[in-house]
Amino acid sequence: MKEGIHPKYNEIIVKCLCGNSFESRSTKAEISTEVCSQCHPFYTGKQKLMDTAGRVERFRKRYNIAAAPEES
């Protein structure tokens, strides 16, 4: 590797909005993240329900698409 052309690779602290922090390595001075393994719903087991039904209905209404018949 050539000398002097690569960025410095430092040990940093990554901070999450939930207050959790951990050490990592990066070329950046610091990293802030919105979610981490301590607060992400997949890891905590707390699932958030998304309002996708309202979005689908709004899409169908906007483009005049009839709802598909339900299979019985």
Curated annotation (Swiss-Prot):
Function, as annotated: Binds the 23S rRNA.
Cross-referenced InterPro entries: Ribosomal_bL28/bL31-like_sf (IPR034704), Ribosomal_bL31 (IPR002150), Ribosomal_bL31_A (IPR027491), Ribosomal_bL31_sf (IPR042105)
Keyword Nucleus in annotation: no
Gene3D superfamilies: Ribosomal protein L31 (4.10.830.30)
Keywords: Metal-binding, Ribonucleoprotein, Ribosomal protein, RNA-binding, rRNA-binding, Zinc
Family per similarity comment: Belongs to the bacterial ribosomal protein bL31 family. Type A subfamily.
Cellular component, GO, one term: ribosome
Protein name (database record): Large ribosomal subunit protein bL31
Database matches in Pfam families: Ribosomal_L31
Cofactor(s), names only, from the UniProt record: Zn(2+)
Entry's Gene Ontology BP terms: translation
Chain positions recorded as Zn(2+) binding sites: 16, 18, 36, 39
Superkingdom: Bacteria
Cofactor remark: Binds 1 zinc ion per subunit.
Assembly information from the UniProt record: Part of the 50S ribosomal subunit.
A molecular function GO annotation: structural constituent of ribosome
